[in-house]
Amino acid sequence: MQQLVKARKNGATKADKTRARLIEVTKRLIQEHGSDRITLRSIAASARMKAGSIYYHFNSKDEIIRTVLESGVGGARKSVLQAIDDAGPDSSPLLRLRAALGAHLEYTIQEHFSSRLKAVRRLPKRLRDHHMKQEREYAAIFAGLLQEAQKKGMLRSGFNLSVVRMLSMGALTWVAEWYDPNGPMTPDDIADELMRILSGGLVKQPNKP
């Protein structure tokens, strides 16, 4: 009992650290092999523990994967909200949107989040529905910024903002699949490019007589 109290005073308990290790291992295995190919046995082997010991921390492989996905959305949300806060309350909604998109991109590249999203569709419906609720709450941050910009007359009319949001976030999420950290563009460059497309468009307008 004294050891347990001491561990809690010092921060994470041994169980907390084991759980965190299992999450990190599963995250890496999903990225390398996809969720279909991993098993509790392969997770245990990578974590250097017995498969049966996992049940002290998680009830199933699906529960571990759900936790990995939740940690991903939670981490992205934290990064995005921090970027918005850093932009300042007096900044325009478009500047805050740029900051949010940049933070989203940085996080998805760092965490290779696209590989985890493929696992969502394979979760049991109950776990999938829970994860999608988190995704909707996260997406609402970006939806709110677009709506604020629209109310302030900063956006052209005639666009479906839900589609704009989904296209923008979806495009940035999948950058990790092709991004080369040694290439000519940084994540900031890519986020700036997207904002240029959103704000000015790609196709030249014909000159009016």
For each predicted feature, which ranges?
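Short secondary-structure transition hinges
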Residues: 105-143
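N-terminal intrinsically disordered/low-complexity leader segments
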Residues: 1-17, 206-209
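Amphipathic C-terminal alpha-helical segment
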Residues: 106-110, 139, 144, 148, ...
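Short, basic, alpha-helical segments at the C-terminal edge of helix-turn-helix-like DNA-binding modules
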Residues: 70-77
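Hydrophobic alpha-helical bundle segments that form small-molecule/ligand-binding pockets
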Residues: 86-90, 123-124, 136-164, 179, ...
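Hydrophobic alpha-helical connector segments
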Residues: 67, 81-110, 165-168, 191
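Helix-turn-helix
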Residues: 17, 21, 25, 29-63, ...
